């Protein structure tokens, strides 16, 4: 985790969340925080590409997990880390490989931190 990057990206993450499907009427379901935490753990304990592939599908989740992947990619694009040519986070990590792991984790961390700026609600 790079604190300087986190500080720079928190404003970006707040704006990305505001424009995403994750925020509804200025509120975020607590389920989203759980999903982003699980994603971070999957990347840290496992491998980046399989974690992104898994979270790109809704599976049995009550929320559309692809929104998290979209938000992470948008943060990376706005911070000029990921080029605009990528349409999905999976495309980006597939091409960049494991060396973009820290950038993806930083974006996930800042996304979770920015969620604290919204009202959290139970399902």
Can you say where each PLM-predicted feature lies in the sequence?
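The feature represents the first ordered module of a protein
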Residues: 2-89
